[in-house]
């Protein structure tokens, strides 16, 4: 069952496999009542369900998969639940973005709320996430409390760590979530204002959530750094992380 929020589109995929490996196309048999389904013209299995304005409740539609010679599958049903969010936050710059639902969920949980300007909220999805920002979000997601009244973190670049981030950084260091890195002169620094890569974020979040280890033998072949492979495998197994495109880019 898919879930989304009022006035927020959700992206998903049709589920079908052709035993002969033929390309499949998809056709809607019964349209949804509370929203519309949009399918890309490239023939992929992805679709977008967009609720009608201010609609909430349960919805559904049925579809079939058709192979290259016209054989049709049995009808399948997609169920959707449109919920009213427990927050007034929706993002003006996330309309139509597949991550809009997740962004609202972060606001619901108090993990991250974007900037409010002129009465509208902006998530800034193209902005890089810094190390300091991600430490705070990961700790909030894991339900970890930050230390209070922290003036110094212990890192050599403490002066460049924002005041708001110091309790999180210090707590993360104490809990073993972060270790810092060596600067050119051999000092241990945190670099709070630098963008965090997806691989670094995976290791930090895996430690915060204390996910049970799974097999990570195949990830070295997928361009994932050895030091991040175990964490990436753990989070991918839990459905927290997608490994498409590797983990080297900034988050």
Enumerate the language-model features and the residues they cover.
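Extracellular/luminal low-complexity segments enriched in Ser/Thr/Pro
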Residues: 46-56, 123-125, 190-192
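Extracellular ectodomain surface segments
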Residues: 1-31
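A structural signal for beta-strand boundary/capping segments at domain termini and interdomain linkers
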Residues: 23, 58, 71-75
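Extracellular Ig-like/FN3 beta-sandwich strand-entry sites
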Residues: 9, 56-60
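Feature responds to low-complexity, polar/acidic, surface-exposed segments characteristic
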Residues: 1-2, 81-100, 113-135, 139-167, ...
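Low-complexity "stalk/linker" and mucin-like segments enriched in Ser/Thr/Pro/Ala/Gly
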Residues: 27-45, 112-115
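C-terminal edge beta-strand
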Residues: 70-84
